[in-house]
Amino acid sequence: MLEKDISGYEGEFSELIRQAPTLYRMMTKLLDDPALPRSMSPLVIAAIAYFILPEDIIPEDKFGPVGYVDDIYLCAFVANEVIAASGSPDILVRNWDGLRPVVELVKEILDREKELIGDKRERIMQYIGLDQL
């Protein structure tokens, strides 16, 4: 369904929005990786769940494919936390099936936070109970 939602999208942030299915798959694979620090499981689960919430902070029903920018931002945030907790990006690389290097993608998304989600970071984190981070 996610791939169908973004299929053919060529609008704003399309180069990043096209990464949404791959980021989602990486999050699901991380849950099965025994190297994932246990403390990271709730964050990974939150990122997965956020993709399926119909009325998240930037809802796809209202904004179309550009509504995935908050979902991809959250995945990048969680991926960065996983790197910090595990001490290496290896776990991400091992679970990544995208063409673009995952660490580069995560960095770009985080660097473009304001452009992608504006001032909505705090609301996104509160929505999923991660406002302490």
Task: Give the positions of each predicted feature.
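Transmembrane alpha-helical segments and their cytosolic interface motifs
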Residues: 32-52
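Membrane-inserting effector segments that mediate pore formation, membrane fusion
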Residues: 47-75
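A generic alpha-helix surface/boundary motif
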Residues: 24-25, 42-43, 56
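Terminal, membrane-proximal amphipathic helices
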Residues: 1-39, 77-133
